[in-house]
Curated annotation (Swiss-Prot):
This is UDP-N-acetylmuramate--L-alanine ligase. The gene is murC. It comes from Francisella tularensis subsp. mediasiatica (strain FSC147). One of its GO terms (molecular function) is ATP binding. Pathway: Cell wall biogenesis; peptidoglycan biosynthesis. Gene3D superfamilies: Mur ligase, C-terminal domain, Mur-like, catalytic domain, NAD(P)-binding Rossmann-like Domain. NCBIfam families: murC. Pfam families: Mur_ligase, Mur_ligase_C, Mur_ligase_M.
Amino acid sequence: MNKKILFLGVGGIGVSALAIAAKRLGAHVAGYDSVANKLTAKLEALGIVIFTSPNGVDVANFDIVVYSSAILSSHPLLSQARSLGIQCLQRAMFLSVLMKDFSYSIAITGTHGKTTTSSVLATLLCQLDKYSSFIVGGVVKYADSNIQVNGTDKLVIEADESDASFLFLSPQVVIITNIDLDHMATYNNSYQTLLENFTDFVSKESVKSIYLCVDDQGCRDLLAKYNQSDKNVTSYGFSIDADVQIYDYHIIDEITHFKIRYKGDDLSFKLQLPGRYNVQNATACIIACLDLGFKYEDIRNALIKVTGVARRFDLYTKVISGHQVTVIDDYGHHPVEVANSISAVRDRYPNKKIIHVFQPHRYTRNRDLIKDWPKALSLADQLILLPTYSADEQIIKGAESQDIVKGLSGYLLADGFDHAIYFLEKLANENTVILIQGAGDVTNLVEILSE
């Protein structure tokens, strides 16, 4: 990749990964972000020049400008690049360009679990094939990074459906974890439009193999809608009609055990990640690796080393009011993700009381899923509900935190982190496990607990 590329919004995890990948593939790279952070410091340590002011950036010196969704079209650097006729590419559009440098790419998409599934497959392939690479939307714990370029053989990517940008991508393999109602403004609040976009994605000429979880109704709807016979379509899940069925799921000493029935063979696996949903995610990756020709024993040995992705069921032990308490930090922010996480906590800690500290994320999500929240938020033994993290949205009347628990009783409404800690100090002991959850800044509560 012999190009000079300027990355705008390079302090974000997605664009920073592309900048690193481009540099390792031979491009001359520079970046801009209005605020320096740990990611920009990492880029500078790799020899990438970082600008924090538009002043001094010679846009005319670049062949391509790549920008994140956080960069407005009116941004002076982007406007200048366009006026100069420089090629300007949104993040996913540039990823599609980058993919051409690799001989084989696998895209993971879906409403929930795509980052975790991407991290599982990335961890497996980096052990099974030293020339495999990945670019995903979270920090893969195995590599302590969201990006690794080891060669140009196989590339694992996370394909984002939230803004329909996955339609820019042309992979050879697609894994779909599920199709659910979220980010529906992208799809004009139409489930059929959402399905049509997924259909368009898997119908691309480049796609040869598709893996779908048939435990999910959205994936079943896609299968019913999809009628092309020129691709290898494999369904997986606990369902008895799955092409690859999962069974014998159980936990021993906090290790997840399960089996799959693959082409007539019964194969057993162990996984450090908790919950049925992570078994589903792992199964998709296992099948993809088996179909690529990797040996069962090698996959089995690699899978037990998978530790997932940062902020997905991260485990800590904290001293709270003199008690040693297990605390889990999790990114889940949709009713389905909340329900899955609480189920996983129950499976792993069947004899402990679950205290769920939840920070809703976006008023629009509260509003759009208002009927689904009460059931999901009733599943723990005790709910502590924080104010909604706005993500720069305006408050929507009838869609605040107290509105998503209408009909529930016994929950505690905290007005902030200090108030939540006050409740935790009263409630927590060795017989409790605390699940701190949300996509906003609630992860900071984990750090505060240790102070």
